[in-house]
Amino acid sequence: MKRIEAYTDGACSGNPGPGGWGAILRWNDNVKELKGGEADTTNNRMELMAAISALSALKEPCEVDLYTDSVYVRDGISGWIEGWKRNGWKTAAKKPVKNAELWQALDEARKPHKVNWHWVKGHAGHPENERADELAREGMEPFKYGGRKSLKVQ
């Protein structure tokens, strides 16, 4: 099974507002950068999109070390998601899970892979996390002044 490192980040100008996501995939000496964005979104949605896009870009089952600076993504995928699925995508307080369609997409995107989730402190000088942040900001740029509704660039 191919081993991949994935670094993901999301960004938002206003929350909600225009946002972007970025991801870096690294295996052996190869690097692939991905980015995209939306006109009206939240930071949490962009963090989820970065992880979904990174995993969805893999063309075969892989062992993935996925690095995120999002506590929301880390806690959701490592703990909350199993309870949400058992509860019909409701929280412990019986409220609908926010961003349920993205959590469902992330759950689906991870299925073919063995994913090891890692949290890194954002904006702390981690080079790949900093680059993922740059990609997220680039992905957001077309929407900051009223551009399209969404964009994905590989």
Curated annotation (Swiss-Prot):
One GO process term, biological-process aspect: DNA replication, removal of RNA primer
Residues in RNase H type-1 domain copies: 1-141
Residues bound to Mg(2+) 2: 9, 133
Sorted UniProt keywords: Cytoplasm, Endonuclease, Hydrolase, Magnesium, Metal-binding, Nuclease
Gene3D superfamilies in UniProt: Ribonuclease H-like superfamily/Ribonuclease H
This protein's GO CC annotations: cytoplasm
Keyword NADP: no
Reactions listed under catalytic activity: Endonucleolytic cleavage to 5'-phosphomonoester
EC number(s) on file: 3.1.26.4
Catalytic class of the enzyme: hydrolase
Cofactor binding annotation: Binds 1 Mg(2+) ion per subunit. May bind a second metal ion at a regulatory site, or after substrate binding.
Annotated Mg(2+) 1 binding sites: 9, 47, 69
Subcellular localization: Cytoplasm
CC cofactor: Mg(2+)
Organism domain of life: Bacteria
HAMAP family cross-referenced by the UniProt entry: RNase_H
NCBIfam families from the UniProt entry: PRK00203.1
Subunit structure: Monomer.
Family assignment from sequence similarity: Belongs to the RNase H family.
Chain's role: Endonuclease that specifically degrades the RNA of RNA-DNA hybrids.
Alphabetical list of PANTHER family matching this protein: RIBONUCLEASE H1
Protein name: Ribonuclease H
Source organism per UniProt: Brucella anthropi (strain ATCC 49188 / DSM 6882 / CCUG 24695 / JCM 21032 / LMG 3331 / NBRC 15819 / NCTC 12168 / Alc 37)
Encoding gene per record: rnhA
